[in-house]
Amino acid sequence: MRRRAVFLDRDGVINRTIMRNGKPCPPASVEEIELLPGVKSCLEKLCDLGLFPIVVTNQPDVARGAQRMEIVEQIHASLIQRLPLQGIVVCYHDDSDNCSCRKPEPGLLLEAAARWSIDLERSFMIGDRWKDVEAGRRAGCTTFLIERTYSEKERCVADYCVESLVQATEIVVGRIAQASHEGTQDQ
């Protein structure tokens, strides 16, 4: 039987987004990583339910020359050391590269599904940008949008709009408990 996953965007979901010149930006170093409240306990709850937490993240600053790949890899090594994550799948491309992995394309989720034998239709995508939700939708996942005050040009329709990973986790736990009680395999 294929596994279920919770795909998570990184910045704004796992760790605090850094605002620079009014725009949400990723941490520039390991020292700038600040985990959001409740993240570790949420991931532990999801693992306890048999879900695989997998980070799927766009990191275009590498392609733009604004960040070194080694720094991004150090940040990810730190997150894997601190949190119960199955793995982290990264797109280093910029929009102009027209790749299939950069969200809103579903390539990162498809790659993770192939690598870890994930059942996408029984999995979840949690993000804070329209691109996260759209990637999850295109991959067939149940989607969550953590509402932030970003100025987004695109609008999205998520299955659930929530305030935090904590709230999203409560919904996932509730759906799985309800399905278990009803004896169904669905969420």
Task: List the predicted regions and their residue ranges.
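Short, electropositive alpha-helical surface patch
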Residues: 62-83, 103-115, 144
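Hydrophobic "anchor" residues on beta-strands that sit immediately upstream
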Residues: 5-7, 54, 124, 160
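Non-catalytic pre-domain segments flanking phosphatase-related domains
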Residues: 1-10, 18, 170, 174-186
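Substrate-recognition element of Asp-dependent hydrolases with the DxDx(T/V) motif
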Residues: 39-72, 76, 85-94, 136
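Conserved Lys-Pro-Asp/Glu-containing loop-to-beta segment of HAD-superfamily phosphomonoesterases
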Residues: 100-131
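Active-site neighborhood of HAD-like aspartate-dependent phosphohydrolases
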Residues: 1-52
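Acidic, Mg2+-coordinating phosphoryl-transfer loop and its flanking beta/alpha structural elements
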Residues: 125-163
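Structural recognition of alpha->loop->beta junctions
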Residues: 75-95, 153-173
